[in-house]
Amino acid sequence: MNSEVKIAMKKIALADLLSLEAYEAQRPVIRQAIMDHKKTRRVPLGPNATLHFEDYMVMRYQIMELIRAEKITADEELEGELEAYNPLIPDGKNLKVTFMLEYPDEAERKERLRQLTGIEELISIRIAGYDPVYPIANED
């Protein structure tokens, strides 16, 4: 397969963010939509590991939740958040994935995370007909 598909995802701009008041009013609907959307972007790897594929919609939601929690209104602070979150949106030449390891029991979590140090070097994604792709971990 030699054909390349390039789909550049839009980056989040200040104009894409809602005011605190508007977000609060729309939050229940937005939250339900994002929960439904995120279900289609998760790949479980076992009982304790999941891949979450990031995109514009997910990152915009995360920024809006941060703005809500921290009551951020100044454009300068908002721009700082955009600078932090926009690199987590795929640019059409890559995937952005959060690898979640979840262990509810604190003692087990500490032990497992110690044992799993470096696991990001052992993971790859392979699509039929293509070579495996290995992550660039902690790029952000």
Task: Identify the role of each PLM range.
Residues 48, 53-96:
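A glycine-rich, hydrophobic loop/mini-helix early in the fold
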